């Protein structure tokens, strides 16, 4: 085989792979995803009562209002373009200050008793909207007090919004975004 024939074969193979893997395959997968999983393919968007996009089920948002459940703290200030966890180790004084600040904030919001670690430490992505059912239930009395509701009513809402994965070893969890939206829709 000559150099010219080898180059031609390489260019044709490159062009074919570029066309198939760079254009046709992504378009096909996007089309299939849009048909089979339309909500997820568009970002699992959430809508308010006016039909406007209020966020995504997949990305936590900062919550300052005591009438809502608090998500996990974010190491990146809930900035999705800079997602990532904290590199601070357990012996770092900055980390200890962040944990103590989170604990104080939860106490100020009315949370009593032991506080689960996930409420004071950021997740690996810094944007995780999910909490264990226990972490949500710890906040239920404070949310109920801020909303002038019964604790049992708020706890029932948490239980109604728990999610169970197909894997038997994965604990149940609650999506804070959908739970907070449900608080306004009760």
From Swiss-Prot:
Annotated protein name in UniProt: Potassium-transporting ATPase KdpC subunit
InterPro entries: KdpC (IPR003820)
Family: Belongs to the KdpC family.
Organism: Methanosphaerula palustris (strain ATCC BAA-1556 / DSM 19958 / E1-9c)
Subcellular location as annotated: Cell membrane
Subunit structure, as described in the record: The system is composed of three essential subunits: KdpA, KdpB and KdpC.
Keyword Nucleotide-binding attributed: yes
Its biological purpose: Part of the high-affinity ATP-driven potassium transport (or Kdp) system, which catalyzes the hydrolysis of ATP coupled with the electrogenic transport of potassium into the cytoplasm. This subunit acts as a catalytic chaperone that increases the ATP-binding affinity of the ATP-hydrolyzing subunit KdpB by the formation of a transient KdpB/KdpC/ATP ternary complex.
Main subcellular location: membrane
GO molecular function: ATP binding; P-type potassium transmembrane transporter activity
């Amino acid at each position: 085989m000559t150099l010219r024939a080898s180059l031609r074969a390489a260019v044709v193979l490159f062009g074919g792979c570029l066309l198939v893997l760079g254009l046709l395959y992504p378009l096909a997968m996007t089309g299939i995803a849009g048909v089979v999983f339309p909500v997820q393919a568009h970002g699992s968007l959430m809508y308010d009562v006016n039909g406007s996009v209020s966020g995504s089920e997949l990305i936590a948002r900062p919550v300052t209002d005591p009438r809502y459940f608090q998500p996990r703290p974010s190491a990146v200030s809930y900035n999705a373009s800079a997602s990532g966890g904290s590199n601070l180790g357990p012996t770092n004084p900055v980390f200890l200050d962040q944990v103590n600040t989170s604990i104080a904030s939860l106490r100020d919001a009315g949370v009593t008793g032991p506080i689960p670690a996930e409420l004071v430490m950021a997740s690996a992505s810094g944007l995780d909207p999910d909490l264990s059912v226990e972490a949500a239930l710890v906040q239920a009395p404070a949310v109920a007090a801020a909303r002038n509701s019964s604790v049992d009513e708020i706890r029932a809402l948490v239980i109604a919004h728990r999610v169970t994965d197909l894997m038997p070893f994965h604990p149940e969890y609650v999506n804070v975004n959908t739970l907070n939206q449900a608080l306004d829709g009760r």
